[in-house]
Curated annotation (Swiss-Prot):
Record key words, sorted: Ribonucleoprotein, Ribosomal protein
Sequence intervals crossing the membrane: none
GO cellular component: cytoplasm; small ribosomal subunit
Similarity-based family: Belongs to the bacterial ribosomal protein bS16 family.
Protein name (record): Small ribosomal subunit protein bS16
Entries under Pfam families matching the protein: Ribosomal_S16
PANTHER family: 30S RIBOSOMAL PROTEIN S16, SMALL RIBOSOMAL SUBUNIT PROTEIN BS16M
Domain of life where this protein originates: Bacteria
Provenance organism: Chlamydia trachomatis serovar D (strain ATCC VR-885 / DSM 19411 / UW-3/Cx)
Amino acid sequence: MALKIRLRQQGRKNHVVYRLVLADVESPRDGKYIELLGWYDPHSEQNYQLKSERIFYWLNQGAELTEKAGALVKQGAPGVYAELMAKKVARRAVVRQKRRAYRQRLAARKAEAAAK
């Protein structure tokens, strides 16, 4: 069961508000969700409220942010977003290091085979 943190449309005609929810990838946009993580109202002054500790928890459990939800989290909970980006950079560095080591082993094997 893949999970995403995404925006769920609410409200009425010409006054849409959104809920930031954790939902299964296969559930419809306005369908069933697992947990409410915040809301966003583009029409009011104080236009969002987020549960940053729950967002952080679910991101650590493997949930993914959609593009628009990521922008909202970046604005509303910059600490959570910064930590998420730091983890991504660290993962990329590990992959890069493994790839570099593999290429070095491969080059050594080729050099050894050419020397024979």
